[in-house]
Regions:
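Glycine-rich, positively charged N-terminal anion/phosphate-binding segment
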Residues: 41-60
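Glycine-rich loop at the start of a catalytic domain that most often binds anionic cofactors/ligands
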Residues: 44-49, 77-85
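Gly/Gly-Pro- and Ser/Thr-rich, intrinsically disordered tail segments characteristic of DNA damage-repair
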Residues: 80, 114-115, 119-128
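Alpha-helix capping/helix-boundary segments
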Residues: 103-104
Length: 428
């Protein structure tokens, strides 16, 4: 008997209304956003109620949902107005709130009935009994702690029917389930109340202090300044394991990331899910393309977190091992004229005549070409466009659509293609 596989939700981050619309257009089944209160991303361009309402209406056109993260740790007095806030979210049409603090969970459940509640990863759910506990309190979904292994995930799925949401991509906090007080000490900003200053990613000088007395600098003994941050997670080539083990929602981290990141990563995970559900062979055929695509937006090395083993020093960024993307995001397509094969693009970065670029769009469509016939908004032929947000026109040999993105190889790099169709990026 053939096993029927459930299609998991692709859940994307959206720090702004623009990013929400991009995520939905690029295949997100749901997006998670932050409001003006109770979240953990104070710098993410959080949504007003009016923006939430517009986002909900836009997502609905694509059959997508909007969740709101309200996962801060409550201190005395923070609860004032929470009930009214949750009722407003419910009335706007927010599909669920993502919460970790029991006080906020209680307030949402009692004062905004009908609003679905999901348990945040901050609550460190690592076993099925925990999921059953929260189910008894009315929660419908639990975001597993990032520290859960694939073996544990499979066992949890067998023993509970609570919806499971699991991270598949993005930054990994160096602290357990994100509960960090380093920012409190280093910058007087509470990471558990939205003020994380990412102190773990700062560069530090190390000193050897045996017995806490002598102070010897290790500066000459290590190659770079020390940091204590983790590499990023990527499960793009392990999507079959997530689907086979019954994960209900594949979560992508990154509400503060760019539309280049949101569009690329969402596009890839949607394509991965579609391909595997069509056939394992289809997934294997595009797997390497998906992995290669991820590296175009990666800013750190990528690993699989805790899913297959406990991370070692190889999964930590102890020095200057930052991944520098070879591509830069340069424009978004506004319109395309089939007759003249001309695209109107809104510039986001410097564009030069002759740049090697890649167009990509929803449905994992992409092709490479060169910038030709570059004109400014007044129709003047130009060799270089340095001003962001300017409308430009270029010649494009293949049809593109409004909302497609354009990325360019960074200066001094070119792609060389081999006879087997594979490419290698080299310095020009």
């Amino acid at each position: 008997m053939t096993k029927t596989l459930k299609r998991p939700e692709v859940l994307s981050p959206a720090g702004t209304l623009e990013k929400l619309k991009v995520a939905v257009r690029y295949g997100a089944d749901a997006v998670f956003i932050g409001g003006q209160a109770y979240g953990l991303r104070s710098r993410a361009g959080n949504f007003t109620f009016e923006q939430m309402e517009e986002g909900v209406q836009f997502a609905a056109k694509y059959g997508a949902k909007v969740y709101v993260a309200a996962n801060m740790v409550m201190h005395e007095g923070n609860e004032a107005g929470a009930g009214e806030w949750f009722r407003k979210l419910r009335d706007i049409g927010i599909a669920a709130v993502i919460v970790s603090d029991p006080a906020l969970i209680m307030i949402a459940a009692t004062e905004a009935p009908g609003l679905e509640i999901h348990l945040s990863t901050q609550a460190s759910a690592t076993n099925y009994e925990t999921l059953e506990f929260w189910k008894e309190l009315g929660l419908t979904r639990v975001v597993l702690a990032r520290e859960v292994s694939m073996e544990e995930l499979a066992e949890i799925r067998k023993r509970t029917d609570v919806e499971i949401e699991a991270f598949v991509h993005g930054a990994m906090c160096i602290s357990y389930s994100g509960r960090c007080t380093l920012s409190n000490h280093m910058s007087m900003r509470d990471a558990n109340r939205g003020g994380c200053s990412q102190s773990c990613r700062w560069k530090y000088d190390l000193y050897d202090m045996p017995f806490g007395q002598e102070r010897k600098s290790l500066k000459g003994e290590i190659p770079e300044e020390f940091s204590m941050s983790a590499v990023d997670m990527s499960m793009i080539d392990h999507i079959p394991d997530m689907i086979e083990n019954g994960v209900d929602s594949l979560k992508i981290e990154g509400r503060m990331k760019s539309i280049h990141y949101v569009s690329t990563v969402t596009n890839c995970y949607k394509a991965a899910v579609d391909a595997y559900l069509e056939s394992p062979e289809k997934f294997e055929a595009i797997k390497q393309d998906l992995v290669d695509e991820m590296w175009k937006v990666a800013q750190r090395e990528l690993a699989t977190g805790f899913y297959y083993s406990i991370p070692t020093e190889n999964e930590q960024l102890f020095g200057a091992r930052r991944k520098i993307p070879e591509y830069k995001f340069v424009a978004e397509v506004v319109a395309y004229d089939d007759t003249t094969q001309t695209a109107t693009i809104r510039q986001r970065n410097v564009i030069n005549e002759g740049d090697q670029v890649e167009f990509y769009g929803p449905g994992f469509r992409h092709f490479e070409t060169y910038i030709e016939n570059l004109h400014d908004s007044k129709g003047n032929k130009i060799d270089r466009a340095p001003n962001p947000m300017e409308l430009l026109t270029i010649k494009v040999p293949q049809p593109v659509q409004a909302g497609d993105m354009v990325r360019a190889l960074k200066e001094g790099l070119i792609n060389l293609y081999k006879e087997d169709g594979t490419s290698v990026t080299v310095r020009a």
